[in-house]
Amino acid sequence: MKVLSIDFGTKRVGLAISDPDQIFAFPYKVMERTTRDAMFSELLEIIENEKVGDIVIGLPLSLDGEDTLTTRQVRNFAASLERRVDLPIHLVDERLSSIAAEDELKEAGLWDRKRKKNLDSQAAKIILETWLARA
C-alpha cells in the first residue's frame, strides 16, 4: 500500500505519496487551506482513491528539538485526522525539510513563482523519503 506524507502549514498543506512498494516518494499536490471540514474531506478522498496504508506527518520541532506553537498545531491536526481514519499515523521530524526542498527545486531550475507553488509538496516528499529510509 502507498504512504501519504503531509507537510501541514498555516496557509497550505503539501502532500507527497509513495509507490505501492514504498520505495519511491513523489510530490502529489498542494492544498490551499480553506475550512477544516473541506481540508479533511479532500484528504479522506485522496486516502481512499490512492489506497493509502500509512500516513506520515512532518513535525516542525525547533532547531533544539523542542515543541513550538506550530508543533502543537500539527499534533492537534494529527489527532483530528487519527479520529477520522483507521490507519497508522507517524510523526516525523521535519526540521530543515523546507530548506532542502527549496534547494532541490532550485537545482531543478524552477523559477521563483513555480518553486514557491511546489515547495510544500516537495517538502512533503522529503519528509516521506526520511520515513521510507527508516522503515
From Swiss-Prot:
InterPro entries: RNaseH-like_sf, YqgF, YqgF/RNaseH-like_dom, YqgF/RNaseH-like_dom_sf. Keywords: Cytoplasm, Hydrolase, Nuclease, Ribosome biogenesis. Signal peptide: none annotated. Disulfide bonds: none annotated. Gene3D superfamilies: YqgF/RNase H-like domain. GO terms for biological process: rRNA 5'-end processing. It is found in: Cytoplasm. GO terms for molecular function: nuclease activity. GO terms for cellular component: cytosol. Could be a nuclease involved in processing of the 5'-end of pre-16S rRNA. Belongs to the YqgF nuclease family. This is Putative pre-16S rRNA nuclease. It comes from Maridesulfovibrio salexigens (strain ATCC 14822 / DSM 2638 / NCIMB 8403 / VKM B-1763). The lineage of its organism: Bacteria, Pseudomonadati, Thermodesulfobacteriota, Desulfovibrionia, Desulfovibrionales.
